[in-house]
Design a protein with these regions (language model features):
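Hydrophobic faces of well-ordered beta-strands that scaffold small-molecule active sites
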Residues: 71-77, 89-94, 134, 153-159, ...
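Catalytic alpha/beta core domains of metabolic enzymes, predominantly
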Residues: 216, 221-338
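N-terminal organelle-targeting presequences
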Residues: 30-75, 80, 84-89, 95-106, ...
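Alpha-helix-loop-beta-strand connector modules within alpha/beta enzyme cores
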Residues: 118, 140-143, 148-149, 179, ...
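C-terminal extensions of enzymes
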Residues: 335-397
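Active-site beta->alpha loop and helix N-cap motifs at the rims of alpha/beta catalytic domains
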Residues: 79, 95-100, 104-199
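Conserved, mostly hydrophobic/aromatic
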Residues: 94, 157, 193, 208, ...
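N-terminal chloroplast transit peptides
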Residues: 1-43
């Protein structure tokens, strides 16, 4: 299935976002039912195209066809030049995207950045910091507007990670970005805003969602983050499966991780399962996204989750693996509202999450991984400002 403006998510997926830390090639991410044969280096924004199934083109059923009947598959990245082959339906704009655009002067989006740096409104800012913040906001939105012209679905905009522990500033930043989008005639229903899953970020999500502004919570590494974000009404919650697994291989002492290991479960996959069951058992509206997928079995083990961000190497393997017709239904939908209804939660897990309970429940894994993610995003934002400082004013000013 493809995401559309009528879905509860169209992201950058949703994705960043840069989701993965790889080389330096400017790229974009797609969610599709077909896989592109490119060797890619870095993910910048996510684009979600609607591509034909191999069933229609070859008459064969592949593993990819089978898994996409249960979950939205979000391939890692493809280059900008493939818009015509794989028309995107949704996208994300982020600091990493701005860095990539500035590294390629000939890209179609460079004009959007140059126009932001030429904006007279920013020149009148009271301080150099305010002026730079204005430039970055304008650049994000200008690129987002260009992307909105290319996609029928939603454009997700990353909120500065340096605001992660300040609810009011997160809300103000989103309002500022939303105002700029409105001035350029992009309606709120076309937008998502990506916010780190700190307690303050979750509170910002609660306030924004109450205004009808959709949020995408990222860096969720523990059940308390997921449950609190779901209670806040976040539209999308993203879990990084592989990063939790990596942490567990090299660390110990996290009660949540240790409990899953004692049950013989992978901590990342276990969190996705628990999060999905909680959301569906208790009627929350949030959609769940699984990222940092490391192998095909990861995909098979969480079929039924709303979105799975999957590296192209794995997707290519899924596409190249033909499934005989009599095996089509051997792929089991592991997650479903029906199975969620039978899942049991402890009394402690069913609390109305407040800041005290939230911070008490955050274990070493979630604290360390959240901190690392925030530092990475903050570094990208700082690099954008430094780069803008070097290239401002642009040649046409």
């Amino acid at each position: 299935m493809a995401l559309s403006s009528s879905s509860s998510l169209a992201i950058s997926s949703l994705t960043a976002p840069a989701f993965l830390d790889r080389g330096s090639k400017l790229t974009v991410q797609f969610a599709t039912s077909n896989v592109v044969s490119f060797k890619l280096k870095r993910s910048f924004p996510l684009f979600i195209p609607s591509a034909g199934s191999s069933v229609h083109t070859t008459g064969l059923i592949t593993e990819l066809d089978s898994v996409t009947s249960y979950s939205e598959i979000v391939p890692d990245t493809v280059i900008f030049d493939d818009f015509q082959r794989f028309p995107p339906t949704a996208a994300t704009v982020s600091s990493s995207l701005l860095l990539g655009i500035c590294s390629l002067p000939d890209t179609a989006f460079r004009g959007a950045v140059d126009n932001a740096l030429s904006d007279r409104e920013c020149y009148d800012s009271e301080s150099s910091d305010a002026r730079m913040s204005c430039f970055v906001n304008k650049a994000l939105v200008n690129v987002g507007v260009d992307l909105a012209k290319l996609v029928p679905g939603r454009v997700s905009t990353e909120v500065d990670a340096r605001l992660a522990y300040d609810t009011n500033r997160i809300v103000k930043k989103v309002h500022d970005l939303l105002k700029l989008y409105s001035e350029l005639e992009v309606p709120p229903e076309r937008l998502l805003f990506k916010i780190p899953s700190t307690w303050q970020g979750i509170e910002a999500s609660r306030l924004l969602e109450s205004e009808g502004i959709r949020t995408h919570m990222t860096f969720a590494y523990s059940f308390c983050q997921v449950a609190a974000a779901a209670q806040a009404g976040a539209s999308v919650i993203q879990i990084f499966v592989g990063r939790l697994r990596d942490w567990a291989r090299n660390h110990s002492g996290d009660p949540e991780v240790e409990a899953s290991l004692q049950r013989g479960e992978d901590p990342g996959l276990a969190l996705v399962t628990k999060a999905y069951n909680y959301i569906h058992k208790y009627g929350h509206k949030s959609k769940l996204m699984a990222a940092a997928i490391r192998n095909k079995q990861d995909v098979f083990n969480i079929l039924g989750v709303d979105y799975i961000i999957t590296p192209l190497k794995i997707l290519q393997s899924l596409q190249e693996s033909v499934t005989p017709p009599d095996e089509k239904y051997s792929y089991v939908k592991r997650l479903s509202p029906q199975s969620a209804s039978a899942y049991s939660f402890s009394k402690e897990e069913l609390v109305k999450w407040d800041q005290y309970n939230f911070e008490s429940a955050m274990g070493p894994a979630s604290v360390e991984l959240l901190t690392a993610g925030l530092e990475g995003y903050a570094d990208q934002a700082k690099r954008v400002e430094e780069l803008f400082g070097k290239i401002w004013p642009p040649p046409n000013v």
